[in-house]
Amino acid sequence: MAKLVIVESPAKAKTIGKYLGKDYEVTASMGHIRDLPKSQLGIDVEHDYAPQYINIKDKSKLIKELKAKAKQADGILLATDPDREGEAISWHLANILGLDPHEPNRVTFDEITKKGVQKGMANPRAIDEDLFNAQQARRILDRLVGYKLSPFLWRKVRRGLSAGRVQSVAVRLIDDREKEIENFKPEEYWNVDATLGTGHKSFTARLASDSTGKKLLPKNEAEARAIEKGLEGAEYTVGELKKGKRAKQPTPAFITSTLQQEASRRLGFTATRTMRAAQTLYEGVDIAGHGTMGLITYMRTDSLRISDEAVAAAKEYIADAYGEQYICPYKRTWKTKSATAAQDAHEAIRPSVPGLTPDEVDKSISGDTAKLYRMIWSRFMASQMADCQQDTVSVTVYAGDYRFKASGYTVTFDGFTVLYEEATDEKEKKETSLPPLEQGQLLRLKELKSEQKFTQPPARYTEATLIKALEENGIGRPSTDAPIITTIIDRGYVEREQKKLKPTLLGRAVDGLMLEQFPHIVDVDFSAEMEKNLDKIESGKADWHKTVDDFYQGFAASLEQAEKNMEGKKVKVPDEPSSEVCDLCGRPMVIKVGKYGKFLACSGFPECRGTKRLVKDTGGVCPKCGKGRMLERKSAKGRIYYGCERYPDCDFMTWDTPVPTKCEKCGSTLFRKGSKLYCAKEGCGFEMPVPKKD
């Protein structure tokens, strides 16, 4: 009889099955098969927080099939993902199938290649109880908070609300940033720039100080004009000249959080979209000439470690493609930030076969997976390349009683930048190359320009900067970052506005209540300490029962006190005004948040119960009737779609997004589907690739 190998997904099963052959049957559990019940707390607080797991309702048939296969099998191996969630799935599978968790029936694959699968199969182990207990403790903590706190929010704010332990901290960060922006008072200042010539070349230097070295930054136009007047007739000469060399190092290969951040900045992906594509790359895709294989190592990792074998393969490719001089002459190492031993057992995210280039892979895959693979491959390869070498120069220009400064650099060896440089969210102060200069050299003033500026408030978080903030505060984890953002948006606490995260009126009301009644729940340091405690459980250095109890005792006391504090009180969530008028009574309509997002409701409620769907004009025209505007709408399940405003007279609808670009053939609205734009007008058939951003 064949041995039974159980993984999470059919895609992973297909790839692994190809490597294992006919002596093994590889099947999928389709994710978790057991969980805490939805209809009750499911935790016996009085008896050491014992969880009361039940089989997930729609998994009954699957569990029956797994049990039947297990009875016929010549052995069972649990090959779920190598992290907390994967260990929990294996623990529950072992429990259901009657396996001894202390026996070596657990295997893991850091990469799903022939070599990676062979290595995993050669090293079976017992289920890691500490790793499972870390997952179990997190699940119990989150259930205690959600199940106990949500009814409080129903009574004091609005029915249907829910609260989460980590999500509440994320909303707090976003709301705090919004308060900073609202309280920010811009301050005026002026830049004074001199464009200076030497021969046929010129450069720009900025006012920095007076002749004594005192920094100067004019606060208003009068001060700027006074400086301009003081510079009339002044000679501009090269006073101080500093030349040097610097080496710019590449960034390390990705971990989960940096992958999500870079994909957001460079590709415009949400964290969820990034992880979906990464999951596909890890579990396996069909590659021409190679068959089905996993293209990257496991994508949920905190570790920056790279195996010696992968480094050697990268350097071999670099030497062949770019030359020996592009290889880093020493072994690059990056210290993994506060990783547990279990977390650091993984590698960073890298291509499983470094020599498999994006150009070769692009023949077999496209869209998100192709873009993400190219980014992962390029970043990893660059991390093993030589530094970028630069000659630097900074100059202080003397002009009467004032000093101007400029700096620049020249690349003498491009090194890793020939392949990859990290994207940034903020506009960096750009250095430019300066013309050859000598100390004492007289410069020609071509233009003196003063420009009014104002200090800027801090920017709202993007997905990338929020993930970075969570990571820097010790809250983010590979398995939680993407779900956190999705959850707070789905719950109506946060919304996206031009790719920035903005708290809704509901989110601000809930955050204010949480801060007032449960300050420790939304405290960043408290949450970071809890994550450290979970890491200690994973490392076998802390008991999960005590960790949960320490938290719950304080939380239960806070909840009891909050009930007393808020007795007879309710938090009023301000309604968001709109320009719409109620069709039933003519009163103004306001924007409210319901189960499936925002909708319009009459401000005269409860006397008038008029409602409307909240629609958004996309700027496009219906390709079917050519008359109605294309409006963004939401389905009954909250999914966004686009339809003609003349419905039901015109029934055109699509899930694909209208774009501003018009059809080159007929002038109709174009729609985006994946990496292409297409015209939906009957008989046209025009298609084009999505234009690349500069």
Located regions from the model:
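Short, hydrophobic-biased segments on the C-terminal half of alpha helices
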Residues: 275-279, 485-486
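Intrinsically disordered, low-complexity regulatory segments
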Residues: 1-139, 148, 209, 218-225, ...
